[in-house]
Amino acid sequence: MEFKYSTLIDPEMYETEGLCDGIPVRYHNNPELEEIDCLRCHEHWRENVGPLGVYKGGLADQWNGISIAIPEALPDRLGVVSYASEFAFVHDDVIDIAQHGNEQNDDLRVGFEQMIDAGAIKYSTSGKRALQSYIAKRMLSIDRERAIISLRAWLEFIEKTGRQEERRFNNEKEFLKYRIYDVGMLFWYGLLTFAQKITIPENELTTCHELAIPAYRHMALLNDLVSWEKERASSIALGKDYCINFIFVAMEESGISEDEAKERCREEIKLATVDYLRVFDEAKDRIDLSHDTMLYLESLLYSMSGNVVWGLQSPRYYTDAKFSQRQLDWIKNGLPLEVRLEDRVFGLSPSEDRVTHQAVIENGLPESGLGKNGNSSNGVDVNKALLSAVLHEHLKGHAVFKMSDHEVKVKASNGRSLDTKVLQAPYEYITGLPSKRLREQAIDAMNVWFRVPAEKLDLIKSITTILHNASLMLDDVEDGSELRRGNPSTHTIFGLSQTINSANYQLVRALERVQKLEDSESLLVFTEELRNLYIGQSMDLYWTGNLICPTMNEYFHMVECKTGGLFRLFTRLMSLHSTSAVKVDPTTLSTRLGIYFQTRDDYKNLVSTEYTKQKGYCEDLEEGKFSLPLIHLIQAMPDNHVLRNILTQWRVTRKVTLAQKQVVLGLMEKSGSLKFTRETLASLYSGLEKSFTELEEKFGTENFQLKLILQFLRTE
């Protein structure tokens, strides 16, 4: 293969854990093209489909997914291929968390069928058709023949995998046969051949796919290894007792532990590496394979190694992985403005192509790109010459294509429209951070009993999510937290003023949704629990700011207000709008759930390695919070001068050093404070189980989904 667009990477610069030994790694010379189109995809999704937040797909700090897995992508194709891959990631995540994934797949399938059969994609209420149309139109404008091949491959991939989301696999062999297709063998074939301008002769296609199987087995297994935690969490969220992942299948079939299953997965990946290297070496000696087939087979080697390097450091799978500074700047300030061409449009289908294969949709979108000097507004350098050449080459004779802007518009007094994009940016950021979505899961589980109609249930979920994320934004400001879920806290990116303003605006959004429930009692519940939440937070802040240690009773009263309030809010709203014949007061369960959750959080803050990655080491001590273990310690050692002076120093410096934290933890062990907290958690959990059992008996319905959530909270 002749390398024109990529650079060989020094093995000292990346980690493979021995999962692709013998295969070099290359990286595209212009990864900014991928970054722009991935972030553009996020913007389009928000405008046409719904909230997305700071989405974690193909981008990463050091190695972006497409730039390292298709390093020889033609520069004028890298962007749209990255956009298509990012769209597939987002859609895949929707499938993972949706109760009816087949419906989501059907909508995608119909869109591609319309484009291929009729040359146009009709509008759909899902909004995803607009993005499909955008992908198709850009690809067709570049290379109609290969674009159609790529889109057909994508369609075939959806048709082959979309009906098996509920399937359970009996053995590893059966699973891997399915997984090779599920990981996107046909989808990747379409992207790779389009990106590198490869055409596989029809008579070699079957042979080509057969030879490629070890490579796709390698990529499928690697995906299962790095995505295990993410996929397991999705299964729990949906109340499933199985997971479509090699690690789960290996555990089930062989009765082995999770660690043993992971090691088995690693060994299978290494075996697939050896198998494909052998297949490729043998293929090089064949005279019946065309140049393009060999180019495709060789390119798969770099897809394998690139997938390993990207997968092992991707924010998509690892919450402690980061974006690059350039990516963070673009996320915060928006994409750079494109080279200011006369018509200010991007890659559209040539006019002569419109009759046969033009993906038409009657809405449009303003594009973004570079400023006058090839720099973004925040000063980030971008390869202007390359982008300009790519743009000019594919803008000749192109017609305007846009997608509609669904941003909420507000009329100013002078009649001009104001939008909420800037106002919502901090909120969108925090909603995009990794989350277990416990409250949404709990709402779905509680609905086994309450049977709230879908439309009202969605409103209750939205109200809960909005208030929860707004409270996190304000909590981090008030506590001075620098990390949230392993990422920079919202105010460290957007500043205090913008974050507070955005968080306050969320109360307006939540209230608008309460009004849609169309009853005065819902408004009363909303104001009561919102009041409780603020009262609880005020008590917490007062004790911290004035170095006043509360009693145990005062602490639990604060938690009942602050954390229990949101749990009570959604259960009370569900009870109001329940269609169940059984009328039950759920407040005892929801209050106990809130208290248990906060106490558990206090404990994990001190002892959990995962929590350290998410929020920092012993963050509650750093913030001067009076958590349950600290309250017990102060009561157990009221005259300990070391402890008192550490707390006093915090009031002066507002900092607790690592050494000081370790001293406090040592005192907690010595005084039995951590043991006391564990025992308290056990007692609280017993009360939680009692309330749960009582509700099961009253409703006369077993709630396996809620029970699974409670077990997850206890054992996590």
Swiss-Prot record:
Mg(2+) 1 binds at residue 92. Residues 324-713 are annotated as: Prenyltransferase. A motif (DDXXD 1) lies at residues 92-96. The keyword Magnesium applies. A motif (NSE/DTE) lies at residues 223-231. PROSITE patterns: POLYPRENYL_SYNTHASE_1. Its EC number is 4.2.3.-, 2.5.1.29, 2.5.1.81. Mg(2+) 4 binds at residues 475, 479. GO terms for molecular function: lyase activity; metal ion binding; prenyltransferase activity. Dimethylallyl diphosphate binds at residues 484, 562-563, 598, 605, 615, 625. Residues 1-323 are annotated as: Terpene cyclase. Keywords: Isoprene biosynthesis, Lyase, Magnesium, Metal-binding, Multifunctional enzyme, Repeat, Transferase. Mg(2+) 3 binds at residues 475, 479. Mg(2+) 2 binds at residue 92. It comes from the Eukaryota. Pfam families: polyprenyl_synt, Terpene_syn_C_2. Bifunctional terpene synthase that converts dimethylallyl diphosphate (DMAPP) and isopentenyl diphosphate (IPP) into astellifadiene. The C-terminal prenyltransferase (PT) domain of EvAS catalyzes formation of geranylfarnesyl pyrophosphate (GFPP), whereas the N-terminal terpene cyclase (TC) domain catalyzes the cyclization of GFPP to astellifadiene. This is Astellifadiene synthase.
